[in-house]
Every structure is written in structure tokens, then in C-alpha cells.
Design a protein with these regions (language model features):
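Transmembrane alpha-helices and immediately adjacent membrane-cytoplasm interface residues
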Residues: 1-17
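TPR-repeat structural position
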Residues: 8, 21-22, 59, 97
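"A position-specific structural signal for the A-helix of alpha-solenoid helical repeats
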Residues: 10, 14, 41-51, 79-89, ...
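Amphipathic alpha-helical segments of tetratricopeptide repeats
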Residues: 28-33, 66-73, 105-110
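Short coil/turn linker motifs that delimit alpha-helical repeat modules in TPR/alpha-solenoid proteins
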Residues: 37-41, 74-78, 114-116
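Terminal, low-structured helical/coil segments at or just beyond the last alpha-helical repeat
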Residues: 100-130
């Protein structure tokens, strides 16, 4: 039962944390019925798919999985912040500056202590306020 409710999601997140995107993608592709995962693990499944897609420059897939992950409303602020940052960055690259600013405002409303993410937010804030 645990396998169906949790799948390889913890291992996927560990692979992503270590920068092993290819291994994370292989593990994600092994999940045949993501709807059988618990709601929290479904949220992290889509979170991981969004990160893999962003890494591969697949903007549409990254946006789709980011929205799916956020819809569960079960991720921690740090993960939500990462998704908002990725969405803001993509919107900026697509010259959709108002949308980028909206994602940045949502990101700034979170309580995230991650220094790396804070630096990225400052950089994005700087280019958007020009």
C-alpha cells in the first residue's frame, strides 16, 4: 500500500536536490498511476515534474505541472517559492512582464529563508523594476 501512496517521490526529491535530474526523470516516468499517490505526494510529483521540465527548457510542461502542484496547496513555502520563481522567470523571458511581476509579488509574500532563492528573487526584482 505504501508503494502506491508514496511511490518513488522521496527518492525523486533527493535526486533533484543532488542535481541528478536524469535519474529523477527516470523515477518519475516509473510512476504509472500518479492519481493513486496520496494528495501530498501528488503535489510533490507535479512539483518534481515542473522542475525537470524547467531544466529541459520545456516551458509549457513546466507551467502545467507548476499549476497542478500549486493547486493541491500542500507544498511547503520553499517549494511554492521555487515554483513561483520559475514561473516569474519564464514570464520574464517571454516578455510577459506583468505576469512576471504577479508571480514575483506572490513569491515575496511567502516566508522563505533559503538564501539562494532570496538572491534570485532580488535579481529578478531588479530587472523587473527597470
Amino acid at each position: 500500500l505504501g508503494h502506491f501512496r508514496h511511490g518513488p517521490i522521496l527518492k525523486v526529491l533527493l535526486c533533484l536536490r543532488r542535481g541528478n535530474v536524469n535519474q529523477a526523470e527516470l523515477l518519475l516516468n516509473a510512476v504509472k498511476r500518479p492519481q493513486w499517490l496520496s494528495k501530498r505526494y501528488q503535489a510533490y510529483y507535479h512539483f518534481a515534474l515542473a522542475l525537470v521540465a524547467a531544466h529541459q527548457q520545456d516551458v509549457e510542461s513546466a507551467a502545467h505541472h507548476s499549476e497542478a502542484a500549486l493547486a493541491f496547496n500542500l507544498l511547503h513555502d520553499k517549494e511554492v517559492g521555487i515554483l513561483y520563481y520559475n514561473q516569474a522567470r519564464v514570464a520574464y523571458e517571454q516578455k510577459s512582464f506583468e505576469k512576471a511581476k504577479q508571480h514575483l509579488v506572490a513569491l515575496k509574500s511567502l516566508k522563505v529563508d533559503d538564501l539562494h532563492l532570496k538572491q534570485r528573487v532580488e535579481e529578478l526584482d531588479k530587472v523587473l523594476s527597470v
